[in-house]
From Swiss-Prot:
InterPro entries: MsrP (IPR022867), OxRdtase_Mopterin-bd_dom (IPR000572), OxRdtase_Mopterin-bd_sf (IPR036374), TAT_signal (IPR006311). Belongs to the MsrP family. Its EC number is 1.8.5.-. GO terms for cellular component: periplasmic space. It catalyses: L-methionyl-[protein] + a quinone + H2O = L-methionyl-(S)-S-oxide-[protein] + a quinol; L-methionyl-[protein] + a quinone + H2O = L-methionyl-(R)-S-oxide-[protein] + a quinol. The gene is msrP. One of its GO terms (biological process) is protein repair. Mo-molybdopterin binds at N69, Y72, E73, C126, T161, N211, R216, G227, I228, K229. It comes from Sinorhizobium fredii (strain NBRC 101917 / NGR234). Part of the MsrPQ system that repairs oxidized periplasmic proteins containing methionine sulfoxide residues (Met-O), using respiratory chain electrons. Thus protects these proteins from oxidative-stress damage caused by reactive species of oxygen and chlorine generated by the host defense mechanisms. MsrPQ is essential for the maintenance of envelope integrity under bleach stress, rescuing a wide series of structurally unrelated periplasmic proteins from methionine oxidation. This is Protein-methionine-sulfoxide reductase catalytic subunit MsrP. The lineage of its organism: Bacteria, Pseudomonadati, Pseudomonadota, Alphaproteobacteria, Hyphomicrobiales. PANTHER family: PROTEIN-METHIONINE-SULFOXIDE REDUCTASE, PROTEIN-METHIONINE-SULFOXIDE REDUCTASE CATALYTIC SUBUNIT MSRP.
Length: 312
């Protein structure tokens, strides 16, 4: 099974946060916007409420967030998702929620977009030692789980990405980088944590295809590969579910995947990271990586007594 080896990252200049805030106000006043460009034809403004969940850091430029992605269903290169996702159809969409629940059901995208949406400005740390600061739009995963009434025997939550090789060229062909569907999982207490959200947008608009439209998981204290995209199924289970990268290379990608600068990837250090969009054209901006990506005060208690070098 091939394992991805990241290239050296080239960064660009900073976009001040005020530019995003001014742009968001314009979008709200306009009531919606359809963007030109590959993979973004479905973008529309979203109504959000204020949220206390934010970081006092410069936002990563939107052009970087939407053009520098890992989404192997559209290809293994960073530009492939934006280039190859124009034909993907994120609507109509349904998400099946089943397993160890009292009220299994399917949710339509319109139902999910009608939930109270918040903007959450989170750090995002990739296992490849680069990071971004992204203004997500979404709702707590716990609020969706409450609607299906998890049983007492439920201990984990499993997620699956859609399989559409006719629209996702990375899923087509004989040689595949990963087995499909892409799968991920969390412990139930992780899934119900207030920081864990299902995102339906970023930068005040619906998600572009290359960023996981129409629905993706965001768990800000974990490495980015846990943020499964284009979700079509959520199942509650009694045992830990299979996770794609953990199955592909268990010595490199753990089930928990908590950001931990003290536990290196076998092929590179996790002590520092390169913040995308900063550092100028020729250089990189290395900074220290924070335990749990800076969210230790909120989530470290979930792992009390665990050896995080073993449970990585």
């Amino acid at each position: 099974m091939p394992v991805y080896r990241p290239p050296r990252i080239a960064a660009s200049e900073i976009t001040p946060e005020r530019f995003f805030l001014d742009r968001r106000s314009f979008l709200a006043a306009a009531g919606g916007l359809v963007l030109g460009g590959t993979g973004m034809a479905h973008a529309a403004a979203l109504k959000t409420s204020a949220s206390p969940y934010k970081v006092d850091e410069t936002l990563t430029p939107e052009k970087d967030v939407t053009s520098y992605n890992n989404f192997y269903e559209f290809g293994t290169g960073k530009a492939d998702p934006a280039t190859n996702s124009a034909s993907f159809k994120p609507t109509p969409w349904t998400v099946k929620v089943d397993g160890l629940v009292g009220k299994p059901r399917q949710f339509g995208l319109d139902e999910l977009l009608a939930l109270p949406l918040e903007e959450r400005i989170y750090r995002m740390r990739c296992v490849e030692a680069w990071s971004m600061v992204i203004p997500w739009v979404g709702f707590p995963l716990a609020s969706l789980l409450d609607k299906v009434e998890p049983l007492g025997s439920a201990k984990y939550v499993a997620f699956e990405t859609v399989v559409r090789p006719e629209e996702m060229p990375g899923q087509a062909g004989y040689f595949q980088p990963l087995p499909w569907p892409y799968q991920e999982g969390l412990r139930l207490d992780e899934a119900r944590h207030p920081l864990t959200i299902l995102a339906v947008g970023l930068y005040g608009k619906t998600l572009p295809n290359q960023n996981g439209a129409p629905l993706r998981l965001v768990v800000p204290w974990k490495y980015g590969f846990k943020g499964i995209k284009s979700i079509v199924r959520i199942s509650l289970t009694e045992t830990a579910p299979p996770c794609t990268w953990n199955l592909a290379a268990p010595d490199e990608y753990g089930f928990y995947a908590n950001v931990n600068p003290a536990v290196d990837h076998p092929r590179w250090s996790q002590a520092t990271e390169n913040r995308i969009g900063e550092g100028g054209f020729f250089g990189s901006n290395r900074r220290d990586t924070l335990p749990f990506n800076g969210y230790a005060d909120e989530v470290a208690g979930l792992y009390a007594g665990m050896d995080l070098r073993v449970n990585f």
